[in-house]
Amino acid sequence: MKVLIIFAHPEPQSLNGALHRVAVEELEEQGHHVQVSDLYKMKWKSEVDREDFPNFPKDQRLDLWTASAEAYAENSLTQDVLDEQAKLRWADFVIFHFPLWWFTMPAILKGWVDRVYTYGFGHGLGEHSDKRWGDRYGEGTLTGKRAMLIVTLGGWKEHYSARGISGPIEDVLFPINHGILFYPGFEVLPPFVAFRVHKTSFDEMASTLRKRMREIEFTKPIPYRNQNDGEYSIPTLTLHESHGGDLASGFGLHTRTEVETTDVKEA
């Protein structure tokens, strides 16, 4: 497979840098073709502003949706953004690798998403009608590709459990897994999460990561619900009462239960 890694850590000799090299090495040993976007090494521009739209009139108020849509349609985005979009089209599998800082990705990686997911590429696709509400959440430009996160954090696994003070790690990462990966069409694999990294053996983390890299073609994706498959009311995009099992609210509603997943496969 063709694998793209978006790597976001400022220090090559860090734990994340070492794990990144482990992932690349293992993927290449398995015969995959790997490209890397090392955002700090690239000195990636992390803010969206007028410079992203060279042809947008300087005397006109900047409307990001309009400017983004026009620049994408005219192929007049900046070269760094065009290059990253080309990498995404090239890849079969995409990995976002980053440390969890203040419960989310580093700003430089969020800036990559803000700039690369332009209108017409990452969003703004498909018809809006009484049957469909755009091509998103399971459909979109990146449909047919797989993605996953490699995440490191200092807290204990128990801190990010169902009763942990920080909330379940599935909930913490939901805005990224569901809102950034699933939204434009990726099938999203369960993340590799290294907890309590300052107290955990590197060899243990590296061994587990190597195993995950060997299994990327066979790992089952998180069974998120596709927006336009009939489980949500349109245009309110609320889940039908007949779905969701005993869950009354929350992120868990948007993942099919084991029973629902089995029913879908047998349908």
Swiss-Prot record:
Subunit structure: Homodimer.
Enzyme class: oxidoreductase
Listed pathway(s): Secondary metabolite biosynthesis
Species this chain originates from: Penicillium crustosum
GN (gene name): traD
Name listed for the protein in its UniProt record: Ribosyldihydronicotinamide dehydrogenase-like protein traD
One Pfam family named in its UniProt record: Flavodoxin_2
Annotated signal sequence range: none
Family, per entry: Belongs to the NAD(P)H dehydrogenase (quinone) family.
Organismal lineage: Eukaryota, Fungi, Dikarya, Ascomycota, Pezizomycotina
Traits of the deletion mutant: Completely abolishes the production of peniphenone D, penilactone D, penilactone A and penilactone B, as well as of crustosic acid and terrestric acid.
Cofactor(s) for this UniProt protein: FAD
Positions annotated to bind FAD: H9, L15, N16, L100, W101, W102, F103, T152, L153, G154, G155, Y160
Documented EC number(s): 1.10.-.-
